[in-house]
Amino acid sequence: MRYIKSEPYYEGLPPFNVSGSPFNVVPIHNYPELMKDTCALINAEWPRSETARMRSLEASCDSLPCSLVLTTEGMCRVIAHLKLSPINSKKKACFVESVVVDKRHRGQGFGKLIMKFAEDYCRVVLDLKTIYLSTIDQDGFYERIGYEYCAPITMYGPRHCELPSLQNAKKKYMKKVL
């Protein structure tokens, strides 16, 4: 995995070209030229207006929210995306959402790769302790990479606010302590 470094942005993250991999993980706000392709990738999975999606991507910053993309060497093609969002009720945590891998590249380890980078980024750059997420049908994947089931949480509202258990809800909430 090769990490693009922009001092001191990635200071402390794993070294460059450790595996000689032809892939990069980068924050989208440092590479605005990737936003249109990223928008198309996300909208292929969860359709939404291009304007709304682009506004969400343009909100990415060095802290939270931050959208990360996995690209080919030379930034030619976006393969995967995820977004890290703040949780108002948990200051040392974030919520990962919009995790998507291009359909042509699923089952090749790219989801695991971008999640691992996001965990490192959260721990080293953002000094966060826990990552939360929700999923409808990918809980097996998240379990395999170390996530555990937890009570539903809200990204908004007062500190330490948890939602009551929703027995019939399809969403499953998970977390990983970093």
Swiss-Prot record:
Molecular functions per Gene Ontology: acetyl-CoA binding; protein-N-terminal amino-acid acetyltransferase activity
Gene Ontology CC terms: cytoplasm
Keywords in alphabetical order: Acyltransferase, Transferase
Residues noted as binding substrate in the record, renumbered to the chain: 48, 53-56, 88, 98, 134
Keyword hit for Methyltransferase: no
The protein's Enzyme Commission number: 2.3.1.-
InterPro entries: Acyl_CoA_acyltransferase (IPR016181), GNAT_dom (IPR000182), NAA80 (IPR039840)
Domain of life: Eukaryota
Catalytic activity: N-terminal L-aspartyl-L-aspartyl-L-aspartyl-[protein] + acetyl-CoA = N-terminal N-acetyl-L-aspartyl-L-aspartyl-L-aspartyl-[protein] + CoA + H(+); N-terminal L-glutamyl-L-glutamyl-L-glutamyl-[protein] + acetyl-CoA = N-terminal N-acetyl-L-glutamyl-L-glutamyl-L-glutamyl-[protein] + CoA + H(+)
First and last residue of the signal peptide: none
Effect in UniProt of substituting residue 98 to A: Reduced acetyltransferase activity
Effect ascribed to mutating residue 97 to A/Q: Does not affect acetyltransferase activity
Domain N-acetyltransferase as annotated: residue spans: 26-178
Recorded consequence of changing residue 83 to A: Reduced acetyltransferase activity
Family: Belongs to the acetyltransferase family.
Protein name, UniProt field: N-alpha-acetyltransferase 80
Native source species: Drosophila melanogaster (Fruit fly)
Taxonomic lineage from the root: Eukaryota, Metazoa, Ecdysozoa, Arthropoda, Hexapoda
